[in-house]
Amino acid sequence: NPSDGLRVEKNPNYWRAGYPKLDAITWRPVVENSTRVAMALTGEADYAFPLPSEQVKMVKDKGALRVDVTPSIMLRFVEMNLTKPVFKDVRVRQALNYAVNKEALVKVAFAGYADVAEGIAPLSVDYAVKLGPWPYDPQKAKALLKEAGYPNGFEVELWSGYNHTTASKIIQFLQQQLAQVGVKVRVRT
C-alpha cells in the first residue's frame, strides 16, 4: 500500500565501492505535524521533513536533534486556471494578489520560517529573478474586482494536493483573506 511508505534497499552492484552507506531506507508519509516531530524526538524516525515551523523552537530547545534552517528551493504558490472565465481578466488575478497579506501568512503558517515569494522561483535558486512583492492592499483588491465586474466578489474552488497541518493553515488563511474582499473559496483536496 503506497500510503504505508516506500522502502528502498542498497544496490549490491552499485558502481561506487563502499556506497551507499545504508542497507535500506524507509520513507513513511506522516501527515500530522506533531506525530512527525514525536517520531523524530523518540528515535522512531531518523529524519523529519518538513519540520513544522511552529515546533522548530521546541525541537531546538530540547537539543535532541539537529535543526538546520536554511534557504529553501521550495516555493508555495496558488495557480489560477486561466481557462476559467473569472481568471481571464488580469484585474481579477491582480486583486487576489493584493487581497492576501503574505507577511502575515508567513507568521501564521510558518512561524516566521519562510520568506515571501518575490518571483516565480525562490531567490535561493541560481539566476532567480526578483520581481518584487505584491503589497497587501485589500481596498485596491476590492476596487479591481469591481472594475472587472465582480463588485460582490465571486465563488471559486481551490484544489490542494496537500493535506498536512501546515497546508491546512495556509488554506484557512487564504479563505479568510479572500473572503474579506468578497471571494468565497471552496476547498477540494
Question: Where are the regions that the model predicts?
Answer:
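Short, well-ordered beta-strand elements
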Residues: 5-7, 22-29, 153-163, 186
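Ligand-binding "clamshell"
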Residues: 57-69
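Periplasmic-binding protein-like
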Residues: 58, 83, 87-124, 169-170
